[in-house]
A protein has these predicted regions:
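Charged, amphipathic alpha-helical segments and their flanking helix caps
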Residues: 1-25, 33, 47-139
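A short, hydrophobic beta-strand-centered structural micro-motif
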Residues: 36-47
Length: 139
């Protein structure tokens, strides 16, 4: 039996996010970086894992809600120091939606993505979009 760990899931999510954005982070955004980032993606597993069994053979599977958060730096102008960079957010969101479904053969799949927060200010110079998807094991 293949044991699937949270680290396996996060690593796969991170690899897929890197196809869309050069800078990615696991679980949470950093408090500080060496350079000002214009865009980045955070991949996380913020919810509990649901273990399920089925039948007399005790076949099992996991269901987890996974989260991809896209952060785009605000445009700073004299008239609006927190202007939302809508073209950049749209580009990244559309590109990320294109990587689904994410399938690791004989292990798990991540599918049914949905945007749950379309664009909101984080109060720290970025707007973010949250995309949730369903991860289900395939063993």
């Amino acid at each position: 039996m293949i044991m699937i760990t949270p680290e396996d899931i996060l690593e796969t999510m991170d690899l897929e996010a890197q196809k869309v954005c050069a800078k990615t982070f696991l679980q949470e955004r950093p408090n500080a970086t060496d350079e000002k980032l214009t865009e980045f993606i955070v991949v996380s597993l913020p919810y509990s894992t649901v273990n399920k069994t089925l039948g007399e053979s005790d076949d099992w599977w996991l269901d987890i809600t996974v989260v991809f958060e896209i952060f785009v730096a605000d445009r700073k102008t004299r008239s609006n120091p927190k202007e939302f960079n809508q073209p950049a957010m749209k580009r990244l969101r559309n590109a990320l939606m294109e990587v689904f479904p994410i399938v690791v053969p004989n292990q798990f799949k991540i599918d049914f993505p949905r945007t749950v927060i379309p664009a909101s200010s984080d109060g720290h110079g970025y707007h973010y979009t949250r995309i949730q998807a369903k991860m289900t094991t395939m063993v």
